Amino acid sequence: MKPKVIRISTVPLSLHLLLQGQLKMLAETYEVLAVSSSGEELHKVAEREGVRTCAIPMERHIAPLKDLIALIRLIILFRKEKPQIVHSLTPKAGLLAMMAARICRVPIRIHTFTGLVFPSTTGWKQQLLIATDKLTCACATYLNPEGKGVRRDLERFHITSRALHLIGNGNINGIDLAYFDRTPEVMRQAEIYRRNPCFTFCFVGRLVRDKGINELVSAFVRLQQEFTNCRLCLVGDFEAELDPVTPETAEHIHKHPAIKFMGWQEDIRPFLAAADAFVFPSYREGFPNVILQ
């Protein structure tokens, strides 16, 4: 009988994008259960990775009552499944999963810090986020910062005195470098988006405040006034409820003739290949996949 491991994130998109291939590999040695909030991506994970999945509603923002309900559901799940390992990523799933796993006395409790929220906040919210990260660390048995910057902030803010295990130089999963080769097919698709001799800046990621989108758009609008032969390509979706951009930024994205909003794209290779420069003004990152891509 294989030992059981539960991998958990707040939203299914994290499992779908960040752990591609990893769950399938784990399933060769372990019985794997992937847990997150419900969504189409959770079904994709089950099919692609060949693992069981379970949907438990979790909120990314602070929601005390819903968080308590999610914690209780996780406790019930862990007692039913009796895993040997619970491994979480993303802040809210980390807090709830590590608490539930400790209550249920799961032997191995791992949390991967994929990026820290509190360094980009201030006041009472920062103190609350620091307290929740400290609680996550206290409940875990192993802590894995995604990158050197994350490890540095955990140490600088005295979040934990426990050992921090950085795998290699960081990153959560690595990427298939061959997949991002500039193959003839990728370059053929890139020609659809290329606008010679226009100079193209490209951003890939969530279009939210934390990713520096307000500053990026503002800087580009000013730049484009002086150098008209340039454009900005934005590949990703908004998160209006969780971390909205300013109304002025949103208006520029939708109406500025030199800003191309491409929305969510399953395959980002043609957009990267069509660009002259990649821009990534994020406030907080671990070791982001998109840089490797």
Regions found by a protein language model. Name each.
Residues 7-66, 153-155, 163-166, 238-240:
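N-terminal strand-loop element at the rim of the active site
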